[in-house]
């Protein structure tokens, strides 16, 4: 669990993890030098659940959830666990979240798992966030498998990712979104990934979300800005370069508008959701990407 100034929500988040059914868990927390009461709340939980909760020593400022999660992956000894989950600080997990994920991994003989979620707003409004469309040939270059807080990964797979980010420190640290990067790593290394249609948690939405659900007009407008200012393209390129991928996509990224037009000819292979396929087609043709 990566935390930063989450005092309003972290107690509910921790309770929902501790109350998971039919699994034995350990929680490792890395706090990014919070300036509110987050760390104190975590320490109080640690006193109540000393065999479950472990708080990593505070080090330098990470400045974002991605680098904080990279720190957790590198510093936690993964060998003693069968499966590893990522947790945000502000969500509510359904009580069977982890057990359901493990059952799906076993039944489908998969290495990695993610799921749909229910976006949960301060007003009480709820919306399904559907990420479970069929995976495409190159979707992993352009999107994550879903919210990282739904990821459940077999130990052996995450250990390989851990080795990779340790051996490629500079490249890995430069990639903002750990969940997108892990999905790309898994797919390029032929690890099987199962995306569950069943929602497994309430995905809390508030003004401090680093990413959040892409449902509202405001959220969509914000993400359009990330495409227009080339942040999105830069992240795609950094992931492709870090993974030393020699695919069709990577070969087009350095060709400017010509490369965009070539990618546009295979637009249906670049995203999972139909609307997102059309969206990226337009971004490529209009040279916004």
Curated annotation (Swiss-Prot):
The keyword Flavoprotein does not apply. The keyword Transferase applies. It holds the Pfam family Glycos_transf_2. SUPFAM superfamilies: Nucleotide-diphospho-sugar transferases (SSF53448). One of its GO terms (molecular function) is hexosyltransferase activity. It is an enzyme of class 2 (transferase). GO terms for biological process: lipopolysaccharide biosynthetic process. Gene3D superfamilies: Spore Coat Polysaccharide Biosynthesis Protein SpsA, Chain A. Its EC number is 2.4.-.-. Keywords: Glycosyltransferase, Lipopolysaccharide biosynthesis, Transferase. It comes from the Bacteria. Pathway: Bacterial outer membrane biogenesis; lipopolysaccharide biosynthesis. Belongs to the glycosyltransferase 2 family. This is dTDP-rhamnosyl transferase RfbG.
């Amino acid at each position: 669990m990566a935390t930063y100034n989450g005092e309003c929500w972290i107690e509910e988040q921790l309770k929902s993890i501790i109350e998971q059914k039919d699994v034995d868990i350990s929680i490792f927390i890395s706090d990014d030098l919070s300036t509110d009461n987050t760390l104190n709340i975590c320490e109080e939980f640690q006193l109540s659940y000393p065999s479950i909760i472990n708080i990593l020593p505070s080090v330098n400022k990470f400045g974002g959830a991605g680098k904080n999660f990279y720190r957790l992956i590198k510093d936690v000894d993964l060998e003693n666990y069968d499966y590893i989950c990522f947790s945000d600080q502000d969500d509510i997990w359904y009580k069977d979240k982890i057990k359901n994920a493990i059952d799906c991994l076993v039944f489908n003989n998969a290495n990695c798992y993610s799921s749909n979620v229910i976006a949960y707003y301060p007003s009480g409004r709820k919306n399904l966030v559907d990420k479970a469309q069929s995976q495409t040939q190159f979707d992993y270059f352009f999107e994550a498998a879903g919210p990282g807080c739904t990821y459940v990964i077999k130990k052996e797979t995450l250990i390989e990712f851990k080795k990779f980010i340790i051996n490629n420190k500079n490249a890995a640290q430069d990639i903002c979104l750990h969940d997108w990067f892990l999905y790309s790593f898994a797919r390029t290394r032929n690890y099987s990934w199962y995306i569950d249609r069943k929602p497994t948690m309430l995905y809390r939405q508030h003004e401090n979300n680093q990413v959040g659900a892409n449902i509202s007009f405001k959220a969509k407008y914000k993400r359009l800005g990330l495409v227009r200012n080339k942040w999105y393209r830069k992240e795609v390129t950094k992931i492709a370069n870090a993974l030393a991928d020699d695919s069709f996509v990577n070969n087009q990224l350095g060709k400017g508008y010509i490369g965009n037009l070539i990618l546009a000819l295979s637009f249906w292979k670049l995203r999972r959701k139909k609307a997102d396929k059309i969206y990226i087609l337009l971004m490529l043709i209009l040279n916004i990407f």
